[in-house]
């Protein structure tokens, strides 16, 4: 079905008029071949149908730049945007349309493709078992453990370490568990995506990974849809191959992209200027991320918190869908504690004795109680000093500071910056280290020995060197 005219171009939103009686379906992809005025070069832009305007016209969202376009002709593809799936995607980097952007061979025309808009699995297809995913990162495994097939949110403002934490999780889980990973870069820095690709190539992890990018320099249409493109690739490995798949989304800023085009689409803005369909769009994505009786998709999502305000509609809407939250705190990063995970604000529904076991649960709660008590004492210390505390409170502060530093750890992906080897700590070793620290076994070791180390044995060795 062809069309010959665009009624208007409003940045990323394009109105298209069809011949009388011809009408594309909602979410269909239109291919628009247009001429750029500056250099008279033909460029093909993909448009996604968003709204029917009546009078044989539709309003669409462009997946590419519309700058300088003035001569138009195009066709309705008769189907939604689709992306390649299966083995052909492993080791490759794609854009939102499933086109390879890694300078490798183009994706073969006969390779399997799936549409990016799909229904969530039916209720009777879902799995009800709960299994813990070991990450090798102490603060995560101890205090906010991740669930296989769950949805995990990494919350933090700009520059507190969301991307580095995601990179470490990709590295650790790929090296230790060997599962397939799909990385969706949504509105992130191109430099970070490039660094991640080369790091994954150097480590060999890229062979079991697929990457999809819609970076911050791209139009909002691409940033809105790229998370769906990555999820579609992950779903294929789950549903057709019966595999456990990890979906990394950095970050869930497609909500911000939606707010950019919402007013142009003619929708009444909602709170803080966001689209009124925010909750619906979020639900359509999140409900597809789940465990079925065949396989699972475990999603780890970096969630940008505008101005560190957790009441902003974008992070607030995401909260309802998550099984675990990892909150990154700027004050901890300023103290040199990395990862800067807030041990008191981070949560997981898996942290219960029935799921993680009695010992793990007991140690985790004791760690949180000690850190909470230390937090309550900080105001007194700031005003009156340590000398005014009771002996019992002094001991709490003494141990809490060591525990706080022991929650930090060197990352493999940060070796080039720190000059120190990264560490993967099994859950059993993590529990053992914190249990002995709570019992006062290492009270005589200096605080600095606990900073940026892995197992408790490394603390002992570092303590001997600094003694």
UniProtKB/Swiss-Prot annotation:
GO cellular component, one term: proton-transporting ATP synthase complex
Protein task: Produces ATP from ADP in the presence of a proton gradient across the membrane. The catalytic sites are hosted primarily by the beta subunits.
Transmembrane annotation, as ranges: none
One Pfam family from the record: ATP-synt_VA_C
InterPro entries the record matches: AAA+_ATPase, ATP-synt_VA_C, ATP_synth_F1_bsu, ATPase_a/bsu_AS, ATPase_alpha/beta_chains, ATPase_F1/V1/A1_a/bsu_N, ATPase_F1/V1/A1_a/bsu_N_sf, ATPase_F1/V1/A1_a/bsu_nucl-bd
EC number(s) on file: 7.1.2.2
Protein name: ATP synthase subunit beta
GO MF, one example: proton-transporting ATP synthase activity, rotational mechanism
Subunit architecture: F-type ATPases have 2 components, CF(1) - the catalytic core - and CF(0) - the membrane proton channel. CF(1) has five subunits: alpha(3), beta(3), gamma(1), delta(1), epsilon(1). CF(0) has three main subunits: a(1), b(2) and c(9-12). The alpha and beta chains form an alternating ring which encloses part of the gamma chain. CF(1) is attached to CF(0) by a central stalk formed by the gamma and epsilon chains, while a peripheral stalk is formed by the delta and b chains.
Membrane topology reported for the UniProt record: Peripheral membrane protein
Record-linked Gene3D superfamilies: 2.40.10.170, Bovine Mitochondrial F1-atpase, Atp Synthase Beta Chain, Chain D, domain 3, P-loop containing nucleotide triphosphate hydrolases
Statement: the UniProt record of this protein carries the keyword Membrane: yes
Binding site for ATP: 156-163
Domain of life: Bacteria
UniProt keyword list: ATP synthesis, ATP-binding, Cell membrane, CF(1), Hydrogen ion transport, Ion transport, Membrane, Nucleotide-binding, Translocase, Transport
SMART domains: AAA
CDD domains per record: ATP-synt_F1_beta_C (cd18110), F1-ATPase_beta_CD (cd01133)
Compartments, as annotated in UniProt: Cell membrane
Catalytic activity: ATP + H2O + 4 H(+)(in) = ADP + phosphate + 5 H(+)(out)
Gene for this chain: atpD
Residue pairs linked by disulfide bridges in the UniProt entry: none
């Amino acid at each position: 079905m062809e069309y010959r005219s665009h009624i208007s171009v409003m940045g990323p939103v394009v109105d298209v008029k069809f011949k009388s009686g011809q009408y594309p379906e909602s979410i269909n992809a239109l291919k628009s071949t247009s001429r750029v005025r500056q250099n008279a070069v033909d460029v093909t832009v993909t448009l996604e149908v968003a709204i029917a305007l009546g009078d044989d016209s539709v309003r669409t969202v462009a997946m590419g730049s519309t700058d300088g376009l003035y001569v138009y002709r195009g066709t309705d593809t008769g189907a939604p945007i689709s992306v390649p799936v299966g083995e052909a995607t492993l080791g490759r980097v794609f854009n939102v349309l499933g086109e390879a952007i890694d300078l490798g061979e183009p994706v073969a025309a006969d390779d399997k493709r799936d549409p990016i808009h799909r229904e969530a699995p039916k209720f009777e297809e879902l799995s009800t078992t709960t299994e813990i995913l070991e990450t090798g990162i102490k603060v995560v495994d101890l205090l906010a453990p991740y669930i296989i097939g769950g949805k995990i949110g990494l919350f933090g403002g700009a520059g507190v370490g969301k991307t580095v934490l995601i990179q470490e999780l990709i590295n650790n889980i790929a090296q230790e568990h060997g599962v397939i990973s799909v990385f969706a870069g949504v509105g992130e820095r191109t430099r970070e995506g490039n660094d991640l690709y080369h790091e994954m190539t150097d480590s060999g992890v890229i062979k079991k990974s697929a990457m999809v990018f819609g970076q911050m320099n791209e139009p909002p249409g691409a940033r809105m849809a790229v998370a769906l493109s990555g999820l579609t690739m992950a779903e294929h490995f789950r549903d057709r191959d019966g595999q456990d798949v990890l979906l990394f989304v950095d970050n869930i800023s497609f909500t911000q992209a939606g707010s950019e085009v919402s007013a142009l689409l003619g929708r009444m803005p909602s709170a803080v200027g966001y689209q009124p369909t925010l909750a619906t769009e979020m639900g359509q994505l999140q409900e597809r991320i789940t465990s079925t009786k065949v396989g699972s998709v475990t999603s780890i999502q970096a969630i940008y918190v505008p101005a560190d305000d957790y009441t902003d509609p974008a992070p607030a809407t995401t909260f309802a869908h998550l099984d675990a939250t990892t909150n990154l705190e700027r004050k901890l990063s300023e103290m040199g504690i990395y990862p800067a995970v807030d041990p008191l604000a981070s949560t997981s529904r898996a942290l219960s004795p029935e799921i993680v076991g009695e010992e793990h649960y007991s140690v985790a709660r004791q760690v949180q109680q000690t850190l909470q008590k230390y937090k309550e004492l900080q105001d007194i210390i700031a005003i009156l000093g340590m000398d005014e505390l009771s002996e019992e409170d002094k001991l709490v502060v003494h141990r809490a500071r060591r525990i706080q530093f022991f929650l930090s750890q060197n990352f493999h992906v940060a070796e080039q910056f720190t000059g120190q080897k990264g560490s993967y700590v099994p859950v059993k070793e993590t529990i053992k280290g914190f249990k002995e620290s709570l019992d006062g076994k290492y009270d005589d070791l200096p605080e600095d020995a606990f900073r940026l180390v892995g197992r408790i044995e490394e603390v002992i060795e570092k303590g001997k060197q600094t003694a």
